């Protein structure tokens, strides 16, 4: 079977690569309520959760290389190709040869993937990974998609994280939940520095290429990738200073520098808000009966030593996954 991880998605290749072509007809994709069929056993999956920037991707690679794992992306912004710096996608080198699924597979101008579509696509990936004798590892920060994938009874018309909604603890997979948690003050400081590093690593140039004058209308934002943090925040900047008007930053006047700084600060603030929402949603899942193991990664932040991460996060994760995999074995 072709490894989708290595498939480069471009508009000219959509008929070949778009994962939506692997979906069943729409009537079977979005039922009123989807219920898991009775099985004699449940497939085992590891689910890595956490706020943006907490280290989910790092832990997923660490575990996949130790337990013959394959990673299924559950970050809805990273489903799309393009804007790899802005969406903070792991490079091929950083993936350490671990197969990834639903990562950069949709063309950037594709419509937003629904939770029902993700449930179908990710379920298929899990079945294929299990059939190869490997361990499916779900990793990403979109908790509404994780919920849609895992719950036994799924109603696409109900938003699970509204205050009026109760979340079921009935799951259609046997799950090992790992929550990589970092204290809010430490995480926010790290996220601010990460935004600065992303801007220095080509995010601004990437966004300038994205803001082609042909896409200056607001309708294009209905597409999935256009909701990425970094794009709407730079709307005002690029409306005032179109990307074709190239000029070195050292030559900018104060007004242009101010518009740029304002956009970067807005990115930081919206990233903080996203992190808070993600933590709140994980806590709701945990309080609803999901057996989520919290891992405190705070000591490893701000430190350059790999040993601290291994001692505080990785070693405990390995123990938890080992117990999970041997459970129920004779």
From Swiss-Prot:
Q: Please give the Pfam families that the UniProt record associates with this protein.
A: IPPT (PF01715)
Q: Where in the cell is it found?
A: Plastid, Chloroplast
| Cited InterPro entries | Dimethylallyltransferase (IPR039657), P-loop_NTPase (IPR027417)
An example of a GO molecular function for this protein is:
ATP binding
Where, in this chain's numbering, is ATP bound? Answer: 50-57
Primary localization: plastid
Instruction: Name the job this protein performs.
Output: Involved in cytokinin biosynthesis. Catalyzes the transfer of an isopentenyl group from dimethylallyl diphosphate (DMAPP) to ATP and ADP.
Q: Which family does it belong to?
A: Belongs to the IPP transferase family.
Its protein name is Adenylate isopentenyltransferase 8, chloroplastic
**What is the protein's species of origin?**
Arabidopsis thaliana (Mouse-ear cress)
Upper taxonomic lineage: Eukaryota, Viridiplantae, Streptophyta, Embryophyta, Tracheophyta
């Amino acid at each position: 079977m072709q490894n989708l991880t290595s498939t480069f998605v471009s508009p000219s290749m959509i008929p070949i690569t778009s994962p939506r072509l692997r979906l069943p007809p729409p009537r079977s994709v979005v039922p009123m309520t989807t219920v898991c069929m009775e099985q004699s056993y449940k497939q085992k999956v590891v689910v890595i959760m956490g706020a943006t920037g907490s280290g989910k991707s790092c832990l997923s690679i660490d575990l996949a290389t130790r337990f013959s794992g394959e990673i299924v992306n559950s970050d809805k912004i990273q489903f799309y190709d393009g804007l790899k710096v802005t969406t903070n996608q792991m490079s091929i080198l950083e993936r350490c040869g671990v197969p990834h699924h639903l990562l950069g597979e949709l063309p950037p101008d594709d419509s937003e993937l629904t939770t029902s579509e993700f449930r179908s696509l990710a379920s298929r990936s899990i079945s294929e990974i299990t059939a190869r004798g490997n361990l499916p590892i779900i990793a990403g920060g979109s908790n509404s998609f994780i919920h849609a994938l895992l719950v036994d009874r799924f109603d696409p018309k109900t938003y699970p994280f509204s205050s009026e909604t109760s979340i079921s603890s009935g799951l259609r997979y046997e799950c090992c939940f790992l929550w990589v948690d970092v204290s809010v003050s430490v995480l926010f400081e790290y996220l601010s520095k990460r935004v600065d590093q992303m801007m220095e690593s080509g995010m601004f140039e990437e966004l300038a290429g994205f803001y082609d004058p042909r896409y200056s209308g607001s309708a294009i934002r209905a597409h999935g990738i256009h909701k990425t943090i970094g794009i709407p925040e730079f709307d005002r900047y690029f409306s005032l200073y179109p990307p074709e008007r190239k000029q070195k930053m050292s030559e900018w006047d104060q007004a242009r520098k101010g518009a740029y700084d304002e956009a970067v600060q807005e990115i930081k603030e919206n990233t903080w808000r996203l992190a808070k929402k993600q933590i709140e949603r994980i806590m709701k899942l945990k309080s609803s009966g999901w057996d989520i193991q919290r891992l405190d990664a705070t000591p490893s932040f701000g430190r350059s030593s790999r040993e601290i991460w291994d001692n505080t996060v990785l070693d405990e994760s390995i123990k938890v996954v080992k117990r999970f995999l041997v459970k129920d074995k004779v």
